[in-house]
Amino acid sequence: MHKASSLSELGFDAGGASSGFFRPVADGCPATPTSSAVPHRRLTKISVIGAGNVGMAIAQTILTQNLADEIALVDALPDKLRGEALDLQHAAAFLPRVRISGTDAAVTKNSDLVIVTAGARQIPGETRLNLLQRNVALYRKIVPPVAEHSPDALLLVVSNPVDVLTYVAWKLSGFPASRVIGSGTNLDSSRFRFLIAEHLDVNAQDVQAYMVGEHGDSSVAIWSSISVGGMPAFKSLRDSHRSFDEAALEGIRRAVVGGAYEVIGLKGYTSWAIGYSVASLAASLLRDQRRVHPVSVLASGFHGISDGHEVFLSLPARLGRGGILGVAEMDLTEAEAAQLRRSAKTLWENCQLLDL
């Protein structure tokens, strides 16, 4: 007797099943075939724009996880760039075979994924708007040449403020929204999972929990999303721990948001966690893993956000070789949805101040 090996063999129409969970972003591209449909492996090239602490942590993590056959590094400081490239090249005997190059934007030609970490540093006393405008000026120099050299690439923005700069990169690149992604709250969600895992004494990989919205002070913790080992956990946590009141929950959310500030206060900058976070996104994208990550996407039309507001913020999205393959339809409380809409309104207002 033949045993069914898939839902379709059991009579389910599995072809469109994902549409019940995910919706495409506006201005998106159709999904690419799964990697199993590609007959021969092609070489993979990743470019990292910005060779600072974050950029080099990302490059190092990509190397050790064997995610690319070639890495191109670009930075405004040529001596530092050459030093960083040489330092990695000297480790060739201990790493998978990879070609490392680095000068200007021309070395990014034919990239599969371009990761932008470059950003202007805030001057003491400088307003947030002025800093944002200087970052836009920097992106005008970075993004159009990158888009010209790699017109089919995926663009992953890591620079802060990541949600607004992802919007800027989308506008300047001319790419469809499905191919422009911000690192968003992927790392915030990892910190959220870590805190819950520490409390329950379980492995963080067995915890599922999302932070969504703006990557910043107004990020939204989706408490109902918490599961441990696939089992919903928030209700049992509240039932067994009376201390899990609204004030305590807000304290946990603030601890997640403040995690980066704590690290910066202790060592001066963040690097390793964001390196692993971005590498996980690169793997999901380039290996067509179709994993769900909370990343900054074009959120128009989701959860009551106006269709007319072109704003990027983090929502759980399915990632694959085509970029954003769909955004999960979360079941939010009205309070959570209202917080998300407030974040969207603030981000939209910031975007309107830019000359794009």
From Swiss-Prot:
Residue positions binding substrate: 128, 160, 191, 270
Signal peptide positions on this chain: none
UniProt GO molecular function: L-lactate dehydrogenase activity
Keywords: NAD, Oxidoreductase, Stress response
E.C. numbers: 1.1.1.27
GO cellular component: cytoplasm
Lineage top rank: taxon: Eukaryota
Inducing or repressing factors: By hypoxia.
Binding site for NAD(+): 75-80, 121, 160
Statement: the UniProt record of this protein carries the keyword Disulfide bond: no
Active site: 215 (proton acceptor)
Subunit structure: Tetramer that arise from random association of LDH-A and LDH-B.
Protein name: L-lactate dehydrogenase A
Native source species: Hordeum vulgare (Barley)
